[in-house]
């Protein structure tokens, strides 16, 4: 009798675990499809199964949906001259984080920016590093503004 009761407890626990797993997977699937649908509508899948399109004036746009059971994907755009790239991470509860990659003769720079392209000071940055970041942003302001304008016309990021 005790072993029968014990087996039932174990089967009940396994059933609950499977149910939780199914609910989590379905919740993730619904979230990803709902959250990324507006972005994938304007950037269709290409023949390789990735969301990628070359837009007007040669700007590339791509959508990377979150990997399995992850909630973080991104939107990307690359300028035709490859000097400026913009990565946008949609936040789970609304809003976005923005990052720029700027290439020049002295190398590449990854810079976190706000929705207007202004640099965000990171806690780990020294004054000198932040001043260099501001200088790079100012030097490439036209390219940055243009890529932001292209992205805003491609996706509604309000």
Regions found by a protein language model. Give the residues of each.
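Intrinsic low-complexity, intrinsically disordered segments enriched in polar/basic residues
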Residues: 2, 7, 96-98, 118-120, ...
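Structured, soluble extracytoplasmic/luminal domains of envelope-associated proteins
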Residues: 79-134
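C-terminal partner/receptor-binding element of secreted or periplasmic proteins
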Residues: 120-158
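N-terminal export/targeting and maturation segments
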Residues: 21-96
């Amino acid at each position: 009798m005790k072993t029968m009761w014990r087996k039932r407890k174990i089967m009940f626990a396994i059933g609950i675990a499977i149910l939780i797993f199914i609910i989590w997977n379905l919740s993730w699937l619904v979230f990803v499809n709902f959250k990324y649908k507006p972005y994938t509508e304007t950037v269709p899948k290409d023949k390789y199964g990735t969301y990628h399109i070359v837009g007007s004036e040669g700007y590339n746009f791509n959508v990377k949906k979150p990997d399995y059971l992850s909630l973080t994907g991104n939107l990307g755009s690359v300028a035709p001259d490859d000097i400026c790239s913009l990565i946008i991470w949609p936040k789970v509860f609304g809003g976005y984080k923005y990052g720029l990659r700027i290439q020049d003769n002295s190398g590449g720079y990854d810079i976190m920016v706000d929705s207007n392209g202004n640099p965000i000071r990171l806690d780990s940055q020294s004054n000198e590093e932040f001043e260099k970041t501001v200088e790079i942003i100012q030097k490439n302001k036209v390219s940055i503004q243009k890529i932001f304008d292209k992205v805003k016309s491609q996706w509604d990021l309000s």
